[in-house]
UniProtKB/Swiss-Prot annotation:
Listed GO CC annotations: cytoplasm; Holliday junction resolvase complex
Subunit structure comment from the entry: Homodimer which binds Holliday junction (HJ) DNA. The HJ becomes 2-fold symmetrical on binding to RuvC with unstacked arms; it has a different conformation from HJ DNA in complex with RuvA. In the full resolvosome a probable DNA-RuvA(4)-RuvB(12)-RuvC(2) complex forms which resolves the HJ.
Source taxon at top rank: Bacteria
Cofactor(s) in the UniProt record: Mg(2+)
HAMAP family the UniProt entry points to: RuvC
Enzyme class, broadest EC rank: hydrolase
Keywords: Cytoplasm, DNA damage, DNA recombination, DNA repair, DNA-binding, Endonuclease, Hydrolase, Magnesium, Metal-binding, Nuclease
Reaction it catalyzes: Endonucleolytic cleavage at a junction such as a reciprocal single-stranded crossover between two homologous DNA duplexes (Holliday junction)
EC number(s) from the headed UniProt entry: 3.1.21.10
PROSITE patterns tied to this protein: RUVC (PS01321)
Classification lineage: Bacteria, Bacillati, Cyanobacteriota, Cyanophyceae, Synechococcales
Coiled coil: none
Name of the protein in its database record: Crossover junction endodeoxyribonuclease RuvC
Length: 157
């Protein structure tokens, strides 16, 4: 089983890919898809589309976990929703099953509290994946937490 966790955004899309082998969680890759702020929005969305397709073609995940987006009154809301739409379209085009989780659900599953701090979530991710160093940048650590939430839901702790 191989899962990709995705933390949506327009400027940065965090991703983390975990494989289960002999009941052990193995971190295969994590990072961010960064889009240039100097580019037009449609070009940034296309960059997410292209780079996510390449990642999926390379790693062939069997399932995906994506953070749910809640509407806040913010100037970036529509851009993030558009980026999330591109992400969901790529996953659907690859016939990858998608599970969605709220930030509170992720924190509760990973760190034991729906109000856990970023550090508490990061520590739990590092413990679960037996990492010596924290994944950088933060968006990739968040994506790993999202993937771990899906694994936990599937009974893989």
């Amino acid at each position: 089983m191989r899962i990709i966790g995705i933390d949506p955004g327009l400027a940065r899309v965090g991703y983390g890919i975990i494989e289960i082998e002999n009941e052990k969680k193995i971190l295969l890759d994590c990072g961010v898809i960064e889009t240039g702020k100097d580019k037009k929005e449609e070009d940034r969305l296309y960059e997410i589309f292209k780079d996510l397709n390449e990642l999926i073609n390379h790693w062939n995940p069997t399932s995906a976990a994506v953070e749910k987006f809640f509407f806040y009154r913010s100037s970036t809301t529509i851009s993030v929703v558009q980026a999330r739409g591109v992400i969901m379209m790529v996953l659907a085009s690859k016939k990858i099953q998608v599970s969605e989780y709220s930030p509170a659900q992720i924190k509760l599953t990973i760190a034991g509290s729906g109000k856990a701090s970023k550090k508490e979530v990061l520590d739990a991710v590092m413990f679960s994946l037996e990492l010596k160093k924290p994944p950088k940048p933060d968006d990739s650590a968040d994506a790993l937490a999202i993937a771990l939430t899906k694994l936990n839901e599937d009974g893989i702790n």
